[in-house]
Amino acid sequence: MQVIVISGLSGSGKSIALTVLEDNGYYCVDNLPANLLLEVTVYLKQSGHERVAVSIDARSRETLHLLPQRLADLRRQKMDIHLLFLDTKTDTLLKRFSETRRRHPLSDNQSTLPECIEMEREMLREIHDLANRIDTSDLSASSLRAWIRDFIGLEPGRLTLLFQSFGFKHGIPLDSDMVFDVRCLPNPHYEALLRPLTGKDGAVIEYMDANSSVNRMFEDIRRFVDDWLPCFIRDNRNYLTVAIGCTGGRHRSVYFVERLARYFTENNQVLVRHRELNA
């Protein structure tokens, strides 16, 4: 039986994620108290459900501290467990709450919205540290739906490498495990014919391939990830997010992510995300 537990900050997209899972055949339970996770999951298994998704977050704050133990209990039952945490930058959450005019679940007469967000972030800290994380700050609803569909299509029990390109001027992705800076390399942006293209286009690829510094940095990053990947696998990680950043996130970082993905796909499960191209 596969169980996906979705957690994260209010406004981060948990409802969208749960809807995608329901549309793909998962039996979904929203706002489940953590202390009921084992009992509900066992009951659903006995009822014939093989794929279940539950949302557990700060709305059930009285029992959140029990979640790590309940996940361990499920693993002892030989269930395939995935904990997914949706993270989002505070300024993005402020904008989303302003647009929807919804109340934060921790709001009261004494706390401002930014204070509620930080309280929730701290409340979920342990879950955040245990989970596979995705930064939804710059993801549209359609991009998040696509990411969730990719996530559930992965082979269970294997570590997945997520290579992500980004632009430093838009901030480092919150879900990064490794971050590499390629801003020191020649920038296709300053070539008039290459500027409107991306790192996926043949002309940009030829430009980058022809530079010895580019190839040397690629080999250094490839070797570093290759050398340390077994350590993350032994640590029972389900996900390893490798983020590659350049200035704008459209040329150099995209080129590196595509090239690294091609190399590692041969022996690993690989996902690719280009944050600025999908924004």
Swiss-Prot record:
It holds the Pfam family PapZ_C. ATP binds at G8, L9, S10, G11, S12, G13, K14, S15. Keywords: ATP-binding, GTP-binding, Nucleotide-binding. GTP binds at D57, A58, R59, S60. The keyword Nucleotide-binding applies. InterPro entries: P-loop_NTPase, RapZ-like, RapZ-like_N, RapZ_C. GO terms for molecular function: ATP binding; GTP binding. It comes from the Bacteria. Displays ATPase and GTPase activities. HAMAP family: RapZ_like. Belongs to the RapZ-like family. This is Nucleotide-binding protein Nmul_A0081. It comes from Nitrosospira multiformis (strain ATCC 25196 / NCIMB 11849 / C 71).
